[in-house]
Amino acid sequence: MSLHHIANRTKKLPPLRVGIGGPVGSGKTTLLEMLCKAMKDKYDLVAITNDIYTKEDQRLLTVSGALDAERIMGVETGGCPHTAIREDASINLEAIDRMLVEFPDADVVFIESGGDNLAATFSPELSDLTIYVIDVAAGEKIPRKGGPGITKSDLFVINKTDLAPYVGADLGVMQLDTIRMRTTAKGLKPFVMTNLKTNTGLAEVVAFIETKGMLQPA
């Protein structure tokens, strides 16, 4: 927590920072859109999107009406997307600081990473909670491949469950593999299976953020 954040939030706790990561096409932007729409009437939200060379995700969120345009900031990371959320998160930390100058009462800052691999993780300096998203269309074997995104994220999301019959994926196998990969000495780390086209599983993701992030409505 920086002194900047404390100085700008004398009456409230610093905003909860929620990092959303996952491979290209897994549904990160759709999840962020749905979370914003589900939570913006209760909480003061802002969002940072990461793309390598464009600000396409920022545009998509704006067009969808997820949040007002001024509450969404696109960051062009260049190079490897994981660098901007892990090894050198300065570009995102600067973006957050800029957004909090404009919206000092923000309750939640969402940070969507650029599409990356299973090894992607957020720096603790950048994110308080991490959500890692994969999609069923990538194959039922993905959960058992492991990697920090699957094993260490605070919440693991298996998205696009509706596609399972079309790609020959067994959701039961994916669930069992996920349980095996996310079981630690302290117990099972949470995961959710979602179909965001029908909002299936969305309420569980919102509840996780509210409970784990100890949010209080604005």
Swiss-Prot record:
Facilitates the functional incorporation of the urease nickel metallocenter. This process requires GTP hydrolysis, probably effectuated by UreG. Keywords: Chaperone, Cytoplasm, GTP-binding, Nickel insertion, Nucleotide-binding. GO terms for cellular component: cytoplasm. NCBIfam families: ureG (TIGR00101). GTP binds at G22, P23, V24, G25, S26, G27, K28, T29. GO terms for molecular function: GTP binding; GTPase activity; nickel cation binding. This is Urease accessory protein UreG. The keyword GTP-binding applies. CDD domains: UreG. PANTHER family: UREASE ACCESSORY PROTEIN G. Belongs to the SIMIBI class G3E GTPase family. UreG subfamily. It is found in: Cytoplasm. Its main location: cytoplasm. Coiled coil: none annotated. Homodimer. UreD, UreF and UreG form a complex that acts as a GTP-hydrolysis-dependent molecular chaperone, activating the urease apoprotein by helping to assemble the nickel containing metallocenter of UreC. The UreE protein probably delivers the nickel. GO terms for biological process: urea catabolic process. The gene is ureG. HAMAP family: UreG.
